[in-house]
C-alpha cells in the first residue's frame, strides 16, 4: 500500500459543489502572487551548475602560469623515522590482556552490528523486491477493470484530505481566513509567495504528485524517496510527464521542482542524500542531541509525508528511532509530519477477540467441532487470521492474549491486498507507544482519525466534498459512498495522522 495512484483530481467539478469549490479556488489564487511565478530556487540551482560546468570547460586565452621553482629534495624517509627502542619490551602482561579483551569486544560488537544490519536489510529487501515487481497499470485500467477501484479512490481522497488540511503553514492558513493570529504587531509583513518544501518518505511510483500540485499552499520543492529503485524510476517518469503536459497538472499554477532518489528512509540516515543535505537536516534531532539544537535547531523542510509506510519501521526500536530522527531532523520548527498507517486499535481488538475465542474452545474441549466465523481461517492454535476476498491479515507466531503489544516493536504479520500487496511482512505500530516515542523528537500529535471517521467528518466540507465526487468516491446524484462493504472493511484497517514539530 506504499503507492496509491491518483484519480482524476483535476477534472471539472460539477453539481452542487461547483460554486463553493470555485470560490475556494479563487480565494487560494488571490493569496498567491499574480503574474509569472519565478522558477524554484532548486531548479535554478541545476541550471547554474550546468552553466558553471560549461564555463569551466571553455578554453582560456590566458598565458600559462610560470613553473614553480624546484624544491630542495626531502631528506631520506628512513632518516625521519624515529622510534624509541625497547617500548614493546616494557609492555606488561596486564596491558597485553587489556588490549586483547578490547579487540575481542570490538570484534563482537562488529559482528552484532553486522547481524542487525543483515536482519534489517532482509525485510527491507523483501519489501523493495515486492514493490519493484508490482506492474505499472494505467489509469483507464484502474477506473474500469480494477476489483478495488472504490477503495483506491477512497484512499487517494483520504491522502488528499490530509494534504489539503495540514500541509499549509499557520501563516498561510491565518491569511486565508483573514486573521493575523500568525504574528504580533511587531512582526514583519508575511511572505506573499512562500512555497512549501516537501519530502515524501516512501513515495512509491509518485502517485501523490498530483495531490501535491493541488495543495492550497503552493509547493516549491518535492523530494521523493523510496527503497524500490524501479518505483523511483517510474515516479521520475510520472513527474516528467507532468512537466511535458502528458500528466494531470490541474489548474493551480506552475509545476513544482521535484527530485527523486532510492533510499531506505527508516534504516538509514537521510543526511547523505544531496538534496536533503542542501535543504537542511539536523543531525542532532532526538535524544542525545545538544540542548541548543533541540530548542533552536531543525531542518529546512515544511512537510514530511509518509503514506502507508511507517509500519515497516517498527521491525525494531532502532529502525523506529531512525525513522523519527529523519523526520524530526528534516522538519523546521512548526513543520508537519503527516501520513497514514494501519490502526493498532483495530489489530489489538481482533487479536484479543480471537485469542478469547480460542481459549473458550480449549476450555470446552470442542476445538475439532468449532467452525470459524466468516472472514476467519484457523489452521493451528497460534495462527490468527482475518479479512475478506480483497484483503487479509495473518499472524503466524504468538500474539498477546489481551491484544496489547509489549514491547511495542517486532510484532510481525503478513498483509495481502488484492492487486496491490502480495503477502509481505508488516509490523504493528502500537499507537500510544509510538506517540510517546515521538515526544523524544519534539513531535506533538495534532490529529488522528480512522479512515471512515475522516470521511464522516469531511464529506460535507465545501472543498473536500466536491473533491470526493470528482475523484469517484461519492455518487454525484445520491451522495452515496462508492465502496462495497468489503472495501469499507479493508479501509477501516487504517487511520490518518498529523504531528507538528515543536
Swiss-Prot record:
Keywords: Methyltransferase, mRNA capping, mRNA processing, Nucleus, RNA-binding, S-adenosyl-L-methionine, Transferase. Its EC number is 2.1.1.56. It catalyses: a 5'-end (5'-triphosphoguanosine)-ribonucleoside in mRNA + S-adenosyl-L-methionine = a 5'-end (N(7)-methyl 5'-triphosphoguanosine)-ribonucleoside in mRNA + S-adenosyl-L-homocysteine. One of its GO terms (molecular function) is mRNA 5'-cap (guanine-N7-)-methyltransferase activity. Residues 93-115, 360-369 have a biased composition (Basic and acidic residues). It is an enzyme of class 2 (transferase). Its main location: nucleus. S-adenosyl-L-methionine binds at residues 159, 202, 226, 264, 307-309, 312. One of its GO terms (cellular component) is nucleus. Residues 1-118, 360-381 are annotated as: Disordered. It comes from the Eukaryota. Residues 370-381 have a biased composition (Acidic residues). It is found in: Nucleus. Pfam families: mRNA_G-N7_MeTrfase (PF03291). Residues 146-502 form the mRNA cap 0 methyltransferase domain. Coiled coil: none annotated. MRNA binds at residues 155-156. The record marks 205, 211, 238, 311, 426, 494 as: mRNA cap binding. Belongs to the class I-like SAM-binding methyltransferase superfamily. mRNA cap 0 methyltransferase family. Responsible for methylating the 5'-cap structure of mRNAs. This is mRNA cap guanine-N(7) methyltransferase. It comes from Aspergillus oryzae (strain ATCC 42149 / RIB 40).
Amino acid at each position: 500500500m506504499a503507492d496509491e495512484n491518483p484519480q482524476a483530481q483535476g477534472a471539472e467539478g460539477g453539481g452542487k459543489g461547483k460554486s463553493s469549490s470555485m470560490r475556494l479556488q479563487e480565494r487560494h489564487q488571490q493569496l498567491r502572487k499574480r503574474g509569472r511565478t519565478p522558477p524554484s530556487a532548486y531548479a535554478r540551482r541545476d541550471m547554474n551548475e550546468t552553466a558553471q560546468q560549461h564555463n569551466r570547460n571553455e578554453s582560456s586565452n590566458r598565458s600559462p602560469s610560470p613553473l614553480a621553482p624546484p624544491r630542495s629534495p626531502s631528506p631520506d624517509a628512513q632518516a625521519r623515522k624515529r622510534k624509541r627502542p625497547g617500548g614493546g619490551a616494557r609492555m606488561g602482561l596486564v596491558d597485553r590482556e587489556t588490549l586483547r579483551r578490547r579487540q575481542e569486544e570490538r570484534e563482537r560488537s562488529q559482528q552484532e552490528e553486522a547481524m542487525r544490519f543483515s536482519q534489517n536489510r532482509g525485510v527491507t529487501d523483501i519489501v523493495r523486491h515486492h514493490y519493484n515487481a508490482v506492474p505499472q497499470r494505467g489509469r483507464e485500467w484502474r477506473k474500469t477493470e480494477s476489483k478495488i477501484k472504490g477503495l483506491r479512490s477512497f484512499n487517494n481522497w483520504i491522502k488528499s484530505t490530509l494534504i489539503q488540511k495540514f500541509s499549509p503553514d499557520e501563516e498561510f492558513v491565518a491569511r486565508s481566513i483573514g486573521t493575523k493570529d500568525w504574528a504580533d504587531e511587531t512582526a514583519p509583513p508575511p511572505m506573499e509567495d512562500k512555497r512549501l518544501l516537501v519530502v515524501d518518505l516512501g513515495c512509491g511510483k509518485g502517485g501523490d504528485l498530483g495531490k501535491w500540485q493541488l495543495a492550497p499552499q503552493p509547493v516549491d520543492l518535492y523530494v521523493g524517496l523510496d527503497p524500490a529503485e524501479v518505483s523511483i524510476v517510474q515516479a521520475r517518469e510520472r513527474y516528467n510527464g507532468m512537466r511535458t503536459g502528458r500528466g494531470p497538472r490541474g489548474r493551480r499554477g506552475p509545476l513544482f521542482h521535484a527530485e527523486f532518489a532510492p533510499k531506505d528512509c527508516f534504516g538509514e540516515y537521510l543526511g547523505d542524500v544531496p538534496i536533503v543535505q542542501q535543504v537542511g537536516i539536523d543531525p542532532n534531532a532526538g535524544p542525545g542531541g545538544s540542548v541548543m539544537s533541540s530548542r533552536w535547531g531543525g531542518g529546512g523542510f515544511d512537510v514530511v509525508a509518509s503514506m502507508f509506510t511507517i509500519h515497516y519501521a517498527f521491525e525494531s526500536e532502532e529502525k523506529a528511532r531512525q525513522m523519527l530522527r529523519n523526520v524530526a531532523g528534516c522538519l523546521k520548527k512548526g513543520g508537519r509530519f503527516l501520513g497514514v498507517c494501519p490502526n493498532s486499535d483495530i489489530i489489538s481488538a481482533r487479536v484479543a477477540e480471537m485469542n478469547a475465542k480460542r481459549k473458550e474452545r480449549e476450555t470446552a474441549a470442542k476445538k475439532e467441532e468449532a467452525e470459524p466465523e466468516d472472514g476467519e481461517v484457523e489452521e493451528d492454535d497460534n495462527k490468527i487470521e482475518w479479512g475478506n476476498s480483497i484483503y487479509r491479515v495473518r499472524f503466524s507466531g504468538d500474539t498477546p492474549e489481551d491484544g496489547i503489544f509489549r514491547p511495542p516493536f517486532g510484532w510481525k504479520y503478513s498483509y495481502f491486498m488484492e492487486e496491490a500487496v502480495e503477502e509481505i511482512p508488516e509490523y504493528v505500530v502500537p499507537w500510544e507507544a509510538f506517540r510517546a516515542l515521538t515526544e523524544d523528537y519534539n513531535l506533538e500529535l495534532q490529529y488522528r482519525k480512522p479512515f471512515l471517521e475522516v470521511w464522516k467528518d469531511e464529506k460535507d466540507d465545501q472543498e473536500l466534498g466536491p473533491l470526493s465526487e470528482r475523484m469517484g468516491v461519492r455518487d454525484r446524484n445520491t451522495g452515496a459512498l462508492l465502496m462495497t462493504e468489503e472495501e469499507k472493511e479493508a479501509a477501516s484497517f487504517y487511520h490518518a495522522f498529523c504531528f507538528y514539530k515543536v
